[in-house]
């Protein structure tokens, strides 16, 4: 159970949940930490066990039922007629929290050899929250939750290339309608779209190469106040993912694949603000607490499209910091006789951008009509701050995949 004092403005409440402060001062600059934060970060959580076991790798791996999150264009090359999967991710268990969970349901249907449609439902439960006032009196109790519902269409444009388009509705209710002083709160809502592409070709009789790109969550800013304020609203996690994967068939029974993903948020980087101190003749600090002159970087309060473009060149430390904003995933998958899989991977995020570093491993077993997958996350950040205190440490994912076409054919 968690307690939150509901006595400040909603912006502060938003920061309690997600750390969504978009300004830094000299103290932050000295520490070097300049993370990019957004609303509804649950959209960035890897929902399935296969990709979760490969270091969050997925934009160019072979198509599967969970391709929606990683690259909807891959559905055009999927072999089975129809499929569905359900995944469950217990979240932040390393913090001793037992009631935060992600549930994920996805499915697809091949209209013909060229076209495929797909859908997904993502539900994030943040557990029980008790709201208190300045006197610690309980003023309410609520279970914050978020969800996203999406549909996608994928089509082959050639024997080697496909594109995908997806639309998504996002709903985030963190406060249950509680008010912060005179500021009323509402559930945040947004509409977003994904645009993706996938290319695959044979390098030899036993080796293939695939390349993928996905720009996801292109949509309106999200606000939790009754009166929408463009400057006070938060970006949703508009994201660019690019990667490749090489598949090698060793013989009739053994197959391996290895790939790399690069990932970058397409939202503004927080600038550095001047922390100006003014002392009067009596030695009293009369500084203006609202002084917000930008001394490095760019104004993050811009429109969505401007923010996407600006995200490539707005970092306070220039190109060096822009490159630090790229996360890397690398993963390896081994299949034996298309029935048993072993997977491992590594994820890297620069320390100044969050410092997530972890190894992953997992396994999968496929039967005639269903497949069971599991993944496990191991903390790899051994810095003094992160070692032994990574909230993602020991995260497990569970996925159950159904080949509905085989079920119909076999009469199950």
Which role does the model predict for each range below?
Residues 1-23:
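Bacterial Sec-dependent N-terminal signal peptides
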């Amino acid at each position: 159970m968690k307690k939150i004092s509901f006595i400040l403005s909603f912006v502060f409440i938003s920061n309690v949940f997600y750390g969504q402060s978009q300004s830094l001062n000299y103290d932050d600059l000295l520490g070097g930490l300049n993370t990019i934060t957004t609303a509804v970060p649950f959209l960035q959580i890897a929902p399935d066990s296969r990709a979760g076991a490969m270091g969050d790798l997925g934009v160019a791996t072979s198509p599967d039922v969970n391709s929606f999150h990683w690259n909807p264009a891959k559905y055009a090359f999927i072999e089975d007629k129809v499929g569905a999967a359900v995944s469950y991710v217990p979240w932040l268990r390393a913090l001793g929290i037992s009631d935060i969970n992600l549930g994920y349901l996805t499915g697809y249907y091949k209209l013909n050899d060229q076209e495929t449609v797909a859908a997904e439902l993502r539900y994030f439960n943040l557990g029980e929250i008790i709201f208190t006032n300045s006197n610690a009196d309980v003023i309410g109790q609520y279970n914050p939750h978020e969800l996203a519902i999406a549909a996608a269409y994928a089509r082959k444009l050639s024997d080697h290339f496909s594109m995908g388009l997806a639309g998504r509705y996002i709903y985030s209710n963190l406060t249950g309608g509680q008010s912060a002083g005179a500021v009323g709160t509402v559930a945040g809502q947004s509409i977003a779209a994904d645009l993706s592409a996938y290319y695959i070709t044979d390098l030899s009789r036993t080796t293939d190469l695939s390349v993928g790109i996905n720009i996801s969550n292109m949509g309106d800013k999200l606000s939790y106040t009754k009166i929408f304020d463009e400057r006070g609203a938060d970006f949703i996690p508009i994201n660019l993912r690019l990667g490749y994967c090489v598949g090698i068939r060793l013989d009739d029974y053994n197959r391996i694949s290895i790939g790399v993903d690069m990932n970058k948020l397409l939202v503004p980087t927080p600038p550095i603000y001047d922390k100006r101190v003014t002392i009067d003749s009596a030695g009293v600090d009369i500084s203006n607490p609202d002084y917000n002159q930008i001394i490095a970087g760019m104004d993050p309060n811009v429109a969505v499209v401007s923010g996407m473009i600006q995200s490539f060149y707005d970092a306070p430390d220039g190109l060096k910091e822009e490159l630090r904003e790229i996360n890397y995933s690398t993963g390896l998958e081994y299949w034996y006789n298309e029935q048993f899989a072993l997977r491992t991977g590594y994820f890297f995020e620069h320390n100044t951008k969050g410092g997530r570093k972890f190894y992953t491993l997992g396994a999968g077993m496929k039967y005639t009509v269903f497949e069971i997958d599991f993944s496990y996350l191991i903390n790899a950040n051994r810095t003094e701050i992160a070692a032994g205190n990574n909230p993602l440490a020991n995260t497990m994912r569970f996925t159950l995949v159904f080949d509905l076409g085989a079920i119909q054919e076999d009469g199950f």
